[in-house]
């Protein structure tokens, strides 16, 4: 199926590992020119080795001024994937200011900032575009020790709807994907304990965690012209977790 991504210019944050890295590879394979953003230069270097032709930007999205400087001259962007995130897990009574600030700065504030930069460019060019925010099932369900993380993702879902409302008249679509646990290398490590995994799997009707390609496929669909009447949606990639 042709997704119409060839020749489009895409920017992906959190591109060094996991979902972001796989999204970069899939977009380039579909013919897009990709700008990969990560705070870790070594990850970007290995990405370029694996995927020559990818443009890279190394910046910590928690730093507003550095992000503005790094992305202000990134050039025209047609497609944006806001994937960068942190998950600092603490019991509610032990939540620290540092964890709160870092989580909201990366998971929400950076989405606003990067999307503003990209959307302003689209509007100035009179060009349509698509933005996908990588959210989580944690936006809609309370999970132990996830007070701050769940809050950032709940806010991201509403931000997605607000962006869709205000950017729609400019022909810019905005959607979110909401995965369950994803079997990235980190996911496999964090959920390697069979007892811990069983507690979550018992709440998933399909009885399995998501693979990275499940999430990437959803992202590419929402970026593509195949979803050109879809905006403001939050698409679960969760095996049915949110229906339980």
UniProtKB/Swiss-Prot annotation:
Source organism superkingdom: Eukaryota
> Does Phosphoprotein count among this protein's keywords?
yes
Binding-site list for substrate: 136
Among InterPro entries, the record links this protein to:
L-xylulose/Carbonyl_redctase, NAD(P)-bd_dom_sf, Sc_DH/Rdtase_CS, SDR_fam
Q: Which residues carry this modification: Omega-N-methylarginine?
A: 21
Extract the PROSITE patterns matched here.
ADH_SHORT
Active site at which residues? Answer: 149, 153
- Organ and tissue specificity: Highly expressed in kidney and liver. Expressed in epididymis. Weakly expressed in brain, heart, lung, spleen and testis.
Entry GO CC = acrosomal vesicle; brush border; cytoplasmic microtubule; cytosol; membrane; microvillus
Residues where N-acetylmethionine is found: 1
For the keyword Iron, the answer is no
**Could you tell me the membrane topology recorded for this protein?**
Peripheral membrane protein
What UniProt keywords apply to this chain's record, in alphabetical order? Acetylation, Carbohydrate metabolism, Cytoplasmic vesicle, Glucose metabolism, Membrane, Methylation, NADP, Oxidoreductase, Phosphoprotein, Xylose metabolism
Report the main location listed first in the record. membrane
GO-annotated molecular function: carbonyl reductase (NADPH) activity; identical protein binding; L-xylulose reductase (NADPH) activity; oxidoreductase activity, acting on NAD(P)H, quinone or similar compound as acceptor
Q: Which GO terms describe its biological process?
A: D-glucuronate catabolic process to D-xylulose 5-phosphate; D-xylose metabolic process; glucose metabolic process; NADP metabolic process; positive regulation of reactive oxygen species metabolic process; xylulose metabolic process
Q: Which Pfam families match?
A: adh_short_C2
- Phosphoserine modified-residue sites: 46
Compartments, record wording: Membrane; Cytoplasmic vesicle, Secretory vesicle, Acrosome
Catalyzed reactions per annotation: xylitol + NADP(+) = L-xylulose + NADPH + H(+)
Q: Where does NADP(+) bind?
A: 11-39
Report the family membership: Belongs to the short-chain dehydrogenases/reductases (SDR) family.
Sum up the protein's function in the record's words: Catalyzes the NADPH-dependent reduction of several pentoses, tetroses, trioses, alpha-dicarbonyl compounds and L-xylulose. Participates in the uronate cycle of glucose metabolism. May play a role in the water absorption and cellular osmoregulation in the proximal renal tubules by producing xylitol, an osmolyte, thereby preventing osmolytic stress from occurring in the renal tubules.
Could you identify this protein by its name? L-xylulose reductase
Organism, as annotated: Mesocricetus auratus
Q: Which gene encodes it?
A: DCXR
């Amino acid at each position: 199926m042709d997704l119409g991504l060839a020749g489009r210019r895409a920017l992906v944050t959190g591109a060094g590992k996991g979902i972001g890295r796989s999204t970069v590879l899939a977009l380039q394979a579909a013919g897009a020119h990709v700008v990969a953003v990560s705070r870790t230069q070594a990850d970007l270097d290995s990405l370029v080795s694996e995927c020559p032709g990818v443009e890279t930007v190394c910046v910590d999205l928690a730093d507003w001024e550095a992000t503005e400087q790094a992305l202000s001259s990134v050039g025209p962007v047609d497609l944006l994937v806001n994937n960068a995130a942190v998950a600092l897990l603490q019991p509610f009574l032990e939540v620290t200011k540092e964890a709160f600030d870092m989580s909201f700065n990366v998971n929400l504030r950076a989405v606003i900032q990067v999307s503003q930069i990209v959307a302003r460019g689209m509007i100035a060019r009179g060009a349509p575009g698509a933005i996908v925010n990588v959210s989580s099932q944690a936006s809609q369900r309370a999970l132990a020790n996830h007070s701050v993380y769940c809050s950032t993702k709940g806010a991201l879902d509403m931000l997605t709807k607000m962006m869709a409302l205000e950017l729609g008249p400019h022909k810019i679509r905005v959607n979110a994907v909401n995965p369950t646990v994803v079997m990235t290398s980190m996911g496999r490590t964090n959920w390697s304990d069979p007892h811990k995994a069983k507690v979550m799997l018992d709440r998933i009707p399909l009885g399995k965690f998501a693979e990275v390609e499940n999430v990437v496929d959803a992202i590419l669909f929402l970026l593509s012209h195949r979803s050109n009447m879809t905006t403001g949606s939050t698409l679960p990639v969760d095996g049915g977790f949110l229906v339980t």
